[in-house]
């Protein structure tokens, strides 16, 4: 999951459309480049085709508003790559992740009531694996580049304590371990 410069695109990507508008007012994200067909293709690359084909596809306009490019039916919302970040980062997320992102935007602990799934099958880059609010890497640090992955949130982040927090551990790892924003990153390969 990417929390970085241009993070608002990713954050808003997983919000249910009603919450996206509220979050979009908080901080405008850069608009994705390309025509509508290219943006839809980019957004759909975030998730398995059976999810992406029925997902809402949306983007953030240059003025920070959510624009639906295609209505969906399965409760997932996909957003295209943010061209202003160091790695491809389209995202496709369910409504539980929307709750997580709403809480993150408000800097409040998320009140997750069910398991949530988000896909980033093109990968992502993150400012930090430990600080949920870092917008750029700390001095002397690099972006944490994560290959294709699925993200999982659970109602109680302590349920993830058995997993390592090292993104180079070779398997699932916890991002933001020890915080209310902890979630499991599951590499696709």
State where each predicted segment sits.
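Sequence termini and other peripheral, non-core segments
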Residues: 8-9, 21-24
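Bacterial N-terminal signal peptides that target proteins for export
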Residues: 1-7
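Primary mode marks residue(s) on the alpha4-beta5-alpha5 output face of response regulator receiver
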Residues: 23-189
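Hydrophobic h-region of N-terminal signal peptides that target proteins for export
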Residues: 11-19
